[in-house]
């Protein structure tokens, strides 16, 4: 946001926003005069100028001032102090993730819980996903004479399982050979490409058996279903932390928050933007394209492996959010998740930038 403010006005704006974030109460000039070392009249004049600039507003003629969305934006971009997590907090978070470093599905739930606790507001996390789901490998495991377990592993680490009917005479050794052939045919392929393999067999390859076609079609279908269920992949935590804020004292606001977090579709609209962006994204109040989110601020960051597999971590809260702490928390958790992804894939991780 490009707006020139002299040093005194910057100090007044910063003080108003910090006090309003702490108290949720409009700020009067006499509240700031002593801490800023100037008279109440001087503070009133500066507040009036900041209101004329669209950075502050007031609810009633005699009431104190509170920030506008533009005021919060100026604060985030120009005034706020860094609020890095303490060394003790960082070590505790790293230890928690280290204990489940090989359990990708548990990372997501832990990330949401840790972020909610650290930022003291609602947290949202999506699992790492390839920009387009890609096949990594399958295993075929004999269950009994009539059933085979298909285990599908996608490149981003997701695992899908289903049972398939099998010929009673098929041995585990034969199943392993079939899995090996399909792994070669489908290496790094998308769902669409795998579906084509089943229906357009190459003349350069031995023909596929009916069971191999069944397996390949099942793989393609599972990958397509995975790509279609985005809503179910947004995990959240911290509803109670968020509802402790005074903005959510009314039942209608509680229902609104539940709709945003449980419904998923409103937050889902923000995920593609976060996946396509570098660094931490801060969206404040009226900057949202959806009316339902205009009383909220959202802070999001991408994590994962560059150019390949990525997810999103973030927080949702009132516009009166503790931005320095929330931004640092999101950035740190995104960095931890990227480290885990880099270790898992042995590839270049995404570094959350400033």
Swiss-Prot record:
<keyword id="KW-0804">Transcription</keyword>
<dbReference type="GO" id="GO:0045892">
    <property type="term" value="P:negative regulation of DNA-templated transcription"/>
</dbReference>
<dbReference type="InterPro" id="IPR023120">
    <property type="entry name" value="WHTH_transcript_rep_HrcA_IDD"/>
</dbReference>
<comment type="function">
    <text>Negative regulator of class I heat shock genes (grpE-dnaK-dnaJ and groELS operons). Prevents heat-shock induction of these operons.</text>
</comment>
<dbReference type="InterPro" id="IPR036390">
    <property type="entry name" value="WH_DNA-bd_sf"/>
</dbReference>
<keyword id="KW-0346">Stress response</keyword>
<dbReference type="InterPro" id="IPR013196">
    <property type="entry name" value="HTH_11"/>
</dbReference>
<dbReference type="GO" id="GO:0003677">
    <property type="term" value="F:DNA binding"/>
</dbReference>
<dbReference type="Pfam" id="PF01628">
    <property type="entry name" value="HrcA"/>
</dbReference>
<protein>
    <recommendedName>
        <fullName>Heat-inducible transcription repressor HrcA</fullName>
    </recommendedName>
</protein>
<comment type="similarity">
    <text>Belongs to the HrcA family.</text>
</comment>
<dbReference type="InterPro" id="IPR021153">
    <property type="entry name" value="HrcA_C"/>
</dbReference>
<dbReference type="InterPro" id="IPR002571">
    <property type="entry name" value="HrcA"/>
</dbReference>
<dbReference type="Pfam" id="PF08279">
    <property type="entry name" value="HTH_11"/>
</dbReference>
<keyword id="KW-0678">Repressor</keyword>
<dbReference type="InterPro" id="IPR029016">
    <property type="entry name" value="GAF-like_dom_sf"/>
</dbReference>
<dbReference type="InterPro" id="IPR036388">
    <property type="entry name" value="WH-like_DNA-bd_sf"/>
</dbReference>
<keyword id="KW-0805">Transcription regulation</keyword>
């Amino acid at each position: 946001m490009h707006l020139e403010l002299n040093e005194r006005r910057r100090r007044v704006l910063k003080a108003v926003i910090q006090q309003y974030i702490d108290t949720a109460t409009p700020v009067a000039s006499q509240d700031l005069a002593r801490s800023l070392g100037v008279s109440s009249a001087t503070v009133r004049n500066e507040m009036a100028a900041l209101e004329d600039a669209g950075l502050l507003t007031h609810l009633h003629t005699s009431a104190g001032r509170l920030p506008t969305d533009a005021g919060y934006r100026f604060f985030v971009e120009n005034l706020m102090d860094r609020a890095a997590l303490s060394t003790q907090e960082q070590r505790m978070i790293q230890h928690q993730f280290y204990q489940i470093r090989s359990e990708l599905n548990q990372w997501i739930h832990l990330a949401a819980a840790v972020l909610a606790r650290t930022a003291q507001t609602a947290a949202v996390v999506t699992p790492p996903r390839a920009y387009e789901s890609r096949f990594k490998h399958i295993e075929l495991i004999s269950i009994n004479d009539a059933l085979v377990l298909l285990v599908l592993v996608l490149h981003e680490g997701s695992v899908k399982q289903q049972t398939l009917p099998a010929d009673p005479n098929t041995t585990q050794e034969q199943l392993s050979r079939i899995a090996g052939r399909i792994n070669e045919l489908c290496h790094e392929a998308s769902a669409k490409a795998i579906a084509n393999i089943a229906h357009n067999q190459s003349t350069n390859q031995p023909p596929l058996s009916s069971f191999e076609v069944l397996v390949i079609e099942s793989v393609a279908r599972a990958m397509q279903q995975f790509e279609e269920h985005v809503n179910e992949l947004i995990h959240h935590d911290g509803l109670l932390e968020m509802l402790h804020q005074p903005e959510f004292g009314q039942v209608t606001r509680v229902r609104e928050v539940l709709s945003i977090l449980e419904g998923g579709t409103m937050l889902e609209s923000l995920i593609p933007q976060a996946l396509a962006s570098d660094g931490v994204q801060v969206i404040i109040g009226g900057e949202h394209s959806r009316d339902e989110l205009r009383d909220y601020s959202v802070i999001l960051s991408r994590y994962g492996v560059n150019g390949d597999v990525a997810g999103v971590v973030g927080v949702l809260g009132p516009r009166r959010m503790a931005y320095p702490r929330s931004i640092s928390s999101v950035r740190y958790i995104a960095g931890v998740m990227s480290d885990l992804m880099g270790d898992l894939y042995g590839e270049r991780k995404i570094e959350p930038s400033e």
